[in-house]
Amino acid sequence: MRFLLRLPQIHFRKLSCSMSVLMGSKQFLEFCLLPSFASYPSSPSYSSSRQVSSVSRRFRPVLASRPVSKNSPYYQRTNGLSSYNSIPRVPTPVDTEVEADKRVVLSRLVTLRRKLAEQGVDAENCPPGQHSGLICPTCEGGNSGEKSLSLFIAPDGSSATWNCFRGKCGLKGGVRADGGLASADPIEKVERKITVEGIELEPLCDEIQDYFAARAISRKTLERNRVMQKRIGDEIVIAFTYWQRGELVSCKYRSLTKMFFQERKTRRILYGLDDIEKTSEVIIVEGEIDKLAMEEAGFLNCVSVPDGAPAKVSSKEIPSEDKDTKYKFLWNCNDYLKKASRIVIATDGDGPGQAMAEEIARRLGKERCWRVKWPKKSEDEHFKDANEVLMSKGPHLLKEAILDAEPYPILGLFSFKDFFDEIDAYYDRTHGHEYGVSTGWKNLDNLYSVVPGELTVVTGIPNSGKSEWIDAMLCNLNHSVGWKFALCSMENKVRDHARKLLEKHIKKPFFDADYGRSVQRMSVEEKDEGKKWLNDTFYPIRCEMDSLPSIDWVLERAKAAVLRYGIRGLVIDPYNELDHQRTPRQTETEYVSQMLTKIKRFSQHHSCHVWFVAHPKQLQHWDGGAPNLYDISGSAHFINKCDNGIIVHRNRDENAGPLDLVQIGVRKVRNKVAGQIGDAYLCYDRTTGSYSDSPVTPGMPERRSPKRY
């Protein structure tokens, strides 16, 4: 009892006792079981026997899992009651307040990291309560790409602060998870006022002048640009002084071992800034010595950037002026640069130099920028910069390189010079098919030939043979130049389409049917040989889904056929079998225009000719004549946007000529090299589905549309 009184919180899960003792000690039972039965209602239904039964189940003797030492505090002897107990195995109590605090911290961290990401700081792997080194989103760690940004996240995730320790950047700011963004602007620096005497500059000694002489820089140029020197211990370094309107604002030092450093807390400007104050043409180079080299070639209107080039072009948008710390020198010199109508960028020819050129052009406007291409040093190598050209080839070649500067490339804007090689190849006909490929019929070749990369729209009244004529022409193209084709023919079953193509290829009917007349059908051997040809020449595009295919779906499969099989032609037959879902506010005319633009881009990009079959609308008062292209159902864009427009019309009037006569009306030819407007007549062989030149050219009436104003 004394043991129980001392440890009232312990639950005895393994208790060895005598039931008789328990039954005989009513007070003991009431004392032990009071906490367990406190929740039961005091009702007669809960009898004493039921209580004892419950107690016996709870205090059922259980063998100990391991011996318990007699010295253990859990081993006690009482009057007539011997008991021992192992360490209780109960779950650790969960502190709900601690768990709630953890959830709050995690929620803050999610919010905080999202806000940091908006500032360009990736803090996904930065734990709270520690300082983490990251790439600065503003200066990107300079040329070396060092992790110069120190980020600290509060242990409770409530806030974060950052600071870039690079002197040229100084980005500093902070953000709170539950509040606004603290200032992330660069630290406001107080610009130092410096003088030649104050920073202890002195005239150049003979040794430094000899160094410049070896680099083809004259003493006169050094004096005009006020190049000086400074003694640091036992070493002499070159001092490039930065002046603005006669005031010394900064100084950059260069050791003979090519180590650079600048005066701290000074204004960053272009080197030689006063030389471009009254000029409309500016040359920008990458180093101070290159600026001096330009002067030796006769160009005084030249400036140099004060810092090294970046490793690569930034993929981010140009930041605002107050945040563009890496290129602050351009903003500081904007009053000078905005007057220039022509800016020649002559940075180094290596990767970082070209990246610097791109960053400068992005900020100053590419439309007024030109770029310099340095001359060749050898068969496989170009000179790197202006001073290297001056030292190796002299001032005349350097001047020539600057005068030959080319307009800076602008996406989507070209000069014809960019295409001279292509024009020469077109003139020499080195690519092939410049005149177009023969259709296989002499009567038609004078009017229409197949040019890679063009779109031909084919129309005609139903059952006039549009698909038959296209299939026959594809067979001719394969036989003559070996072209392959993708067929999106949605009105034909695959087996029927295969039969038609095999008949045209083998020149025999597929079946012993009435249409074959007395011509013997193709043999099994001929069929098997034709199947191989069929498999090597044509690639069906079939939509096996319940829905109709869209034009995007068809062009994606056609692109795959170009890359996988090398097709040179695509047939889309017909237009009205495609899925033409469009936005509620889009008219059919707008949709057709957009669709034809997609087809033409595919055709031109992959140098693949596309035949697009479009049915005419219902003809009113049709007199048996051929329709025209404006009769195509849907939009006038079918004729406006296509390169070639063709009408296929079959004669059904015995008085007008033979019934096997087919009129091929060429109604539009954009490329005069490929053909001209006119009519050609072919004879159709119903047995094999093939066409041949007709010896007669009868006049067949053409349906006229009302005059359009």
Curated annotation (Swiss-Prot):
Residues of the transit peptide: 1-16
Residues involved in ATP binding: 460-467
Residues reported to bind Mg(2+) 1: 286, 348
Tissues in which the protein is found: Expressed in young leaves and shoot apex tissues. Detected in developing tissues such as cotyledons, sepals, pistils and inflorescences. Nearly undetectable in mature leaves.
Cofactor binding, note field: Binds two Mg(2+) per subunit.
Keyword Mitochondrion: yes
Domain of life: Eukaryota
Its biological purpose: Has both DNA primase and DNA helicase activities and may be involved in organelle DNA replication. Capable of producing RNA primers of 9 to 18 bases from a single-stranded DNA template.
Protein name: Twinkle homolog protein, chloroplastic/mitochondrial
Organism: Arabidopsis thaliana
